Amino acid sequence: MSRRGTAEKRTAKSDPIFRNRLVNMVVNRIMKDGKKSLAYQILYRAVKKIQQKTETNPLLVLRQAIRRVTPNIGVKTRRNKKGSTRKVPIEIGSKQGRALAIRWLLEASQKRPGRNMAFKLSSELVDAAKGGGGAIRKKEATHRMAEANRALAHFR
């Protein structure tokens, strides 16, 4: 344990075009092997496709999708004294929920059939903003699991 004071949290930087922190968070999750410019290209192409599909502000669609996918409650695996594991429901904070939502959106878009990542990501974001798609199903499955194990909430 550190003897110094706690490290101060750094705020996420905003991206150069939209001046938005959320966009930068998504770009950092898309990025593989440090190729940030490629991640920016993928996201900007996806944003352009969203603009063409919905004819609304694509940042609003992105925010709406992330808001819809963000979970309120999740499950954490705990082992009891006898050695059996249980999935204990836990509350999820706003930052962790947003990070999970972005991760689920990207996982769901990668699983989609399609031409390229920008196309798949744009489709997933539009579907999530409307209340459908793989990421929404993942959130609902997590909520169902937490609801089923509600009796174990005192284990934390």
Swiss-Prot record:
<comment type="subunit">
    <text>Part of the 30S ribosomal subunit.</text>
</comment>
<dbReference type="InterPro" id="IPR020606">
    <property type="entry name" value="Ribosomal_uS7_CS"/>
</dbReference>
<dbReference type="GO" id="GO:0009507">
    <property type="term" value="C:chloroplast"/>
</dbReference>
<keyword id="KW-0694">RNA-binding</keyword>
<protein>
    <recommendedName>
        <fullName>Small ribosomal subunit protein uS7cz/uS7cy</fullName>
    </recommendedName>
</protein>
<dbReference type="Pfam" id="PF00177">
    <property type="entry name" value="Ribosomal_S7"/>
</dbReference>
<keyword id="KW-0150">Chloroplast</keyword>
<dbReference type="InterPro" id="IPR023798">
    <property type="entry name" value="Ribosomal_uS7_dom"/>
</dbReference>
<keyword id="KW-0934">Plastid</keyword>
<dbReference type="GO" id="GO:0000028">
    <property type="term" value="P:ribosomal small subunit assembly"/>
</dbReference>
<dbReference type="InterPro" id="IPR005717">
    <property type="entry name" value="Ribosomal_uS7_bac/org-type"/>
</dbReference>
<dbReference type="InterPro" id="IPR036823">
    <property type="entry name" value="Ribosomal_uS7_dom_sf"/>
</dbReference>
<dbReference type="InterPro" id="IPR000235">
    <property type="entry name" value="Ribosomal_uS7"/>
</dbReference>
<dbReference type="GO" id="GO:0006412">
    <property type="term" value="P:translation"/>
</dbReference>
<dbReference type="GO" id="GO:0015935">
    <property type="term" value="C:small ribosomal subunit"/>
</dbReference>
<dbReference type="GO" id="GO:0003729">
    <property type="term" value="F:mRNA binding"/>
</dbReference>
<comment type="similarity">
    <text>Belongs to the universal ribosomal protein uS7 family.</text>
</comment>
<keyword id="KW-0689">Ribosomal protein</keyword>
<comment type="function">
    <text>One of the primary rRNA binding proteins, it binds directly to 16S rRNA where it nucleates assembly of the head domain of the 30S subunit.</text>
</comment>
<dbReference type="GO" id="GO:0019843">
    <property type="term" value="F:rRNA binding"/>
</dbReference>
<dbReference type="GO" id="GO:0005840">
    <property type="term" value="C:ribosome"/>
</dbReference>
<keyword id="KW-0687">Ribonucleoprotein</keyword>
<keyword id="KW-0699">rRNA-binding</keyword>
<dbReference type="GO" id="GO:0009536">
    <property type="term" value="C:plastid"/>
</dbReference>
<dbReference type="GO" id="GO:0003735">
    <property type="term" value="F:structural constituent of ribosome"/>
</dbReference>
